[in-house]
Amino acid sequence: MALTLTDVKRIAHLARLELPDADAEHTLIQLNDFFGLVEQMQAVDTTGISPLAHPIEQIEDVALRLRNDAVTENVNRDDYQRSAPAVQDGLYLVPKVIE
């Protein structure tokens, strides 16, 4: 996949970024280099290789100490919403920002 200068400028416009032409050309080169690297990685045959959730386990003989997924504090919605400027039916009311 290769991007064009037009693609980079369009993406910058959609992201609401001001991108001068010199920077756009540099960004184009960087993005195309990145996509080239991704294509190289996708070309590698990984059949039979299990995914690594924690790669450090492959080089060190230690078990990662992950905490248990347990509730550590109670959430009291009323306490949090007490300081909100506007709440209705348990939801925060905010001004409309998109038409």
UniProtKB/Swiss-Prot annotation:
Its EC number is 6.3.5.-. Belongs to the GatC family. NCBIfam families: gatC. Pfam families: GatC. Signal peptide: none annotated. The gene is gatC. HAMAP family: GatC. GO terms for molecular function: asparaginyl-tRNA synthase (glutamine-hydrolyzing) activity; ATP binding; glutaminyl-tRNA synthase (glutamine-hydrolyzing) activity. It comes from the Bacteria. Heterotrimer of A, B and C subunits. It catalyses: L-glutamyl-tRNA(Gln) + L-glutamine + ATP + H2O = L-glutaminyl-tRNA(Gln) + L-glutamate + ADP + phosphate + H(+); L-aspartyl-tRNA(Asn) + L-glutamine + ATP + H2O = L-asparaginyl-tRNA(Asn) + L-glutamate + ADP + phosphate + 2 H(+). Keywords: ATP-binding, Ligase, Nucleotide-binding, Protein biosynthesis. This is Aspartyl/glutamyl-tRNA(Asn/Gln) amidotransferase subunit C. It comes from Paraburkholderia phymatum (strain DSM 17167 / CIP 108236 / LMG 21445 / STM815) (Burkholderia phymatum). Allows the formation of correctly charged Asn-tRNA(Asn) or Gln-tRNA(Gln) through the transamidation of misacylated Asp-tRNA(Asn) or Glu-tRNA(Gln) in organisms which lack either or both of asparaginyl-tRNA or glutaminyl-tRNA synthetases. The reaction takes place in the presence of glutamine and ATP through an activated phospho-Asp-tRNA(Asn) or phospho-Glu-tRNA(Gln). GO terms for biological process: glutaminyl-tRNAGln biosynthesis via transamidation; regulation of translational fidelity; translation.
